[in-house]
Amino acid sequence: MSSQFIFEDVPQRNAATFNPEVGYVAFIGKYGQQLNFGVARVFFLNQKKAKMVLHKTAQPSVDLTFGGVKFTVVNNHFPQYVSNPVPDNAITLHRMSGYLARWIADTCKASVLKLAEASAQIVMPLAEVKGCTWADGYTMYLGFAPGAEMFLDAFDFYPLVIEMHRVLKDNMDVNFMKKVLRQRYGTMTAEEWMTQKITEIKAAFNSVGQLAWAKSGFSPAARTFLQQFGINI
């Protein structure tokens, strides 16, 4: 007696339909009235911890509260869920990071007073470890946020060149750059800005090149301390 094995078609995973601009507008439409710099501060200081929590949580959708505001996120960090398709209108931790960074940038661009307020409250951990501060400009500082690569125009190409420096200086696998190299710059496709925006990209690359760029885990104060003993990082 023969056994039967039946195989059915499965939906293709198609990430090409996701539009960050549309996603951002929907995010602001849902949470915009609740956002403030305090919420953003709590999020970025706890983003790594939240990622670890999701990695251990066997739930496809999780409510995370930052600064008193509850966000429902799709959990694509739990090992069994990593390959699950994410709906275009859903929020992941990565998308939320990019959306919040974009919201901060838009708010700072519209008001010098808001820029001063943001710089006094919000800390971007990865930027700080690399020697970047608010004094280097909000587009560079916020460009270190995961997800900022979705909005290359809002961040003056800094998310792109930051990843370049991570490849060159931190030995990051260049394959991690695939996502940023597919992004649009405003209405321009990746193929267009790669040839038409070289001057701007090189300027941003050189600006980031001026940072101390310590290896992760060493703050500017720690580097200065170690230099007194001949240890240069």
Swiss-Prot record:
GO terms for cellular component: ribonucleoprotein complex; viral nucleocapsid. Transmembrane segments: none annotated. The keyword Thylakoid does not apply. One of its GO terms (molecular function) is RNA binding. It is found in: Virion. It comes from the Viruses. Homotetramer. Binds the viral genomic RNA. This is Nucleoprotein. The gene is N.
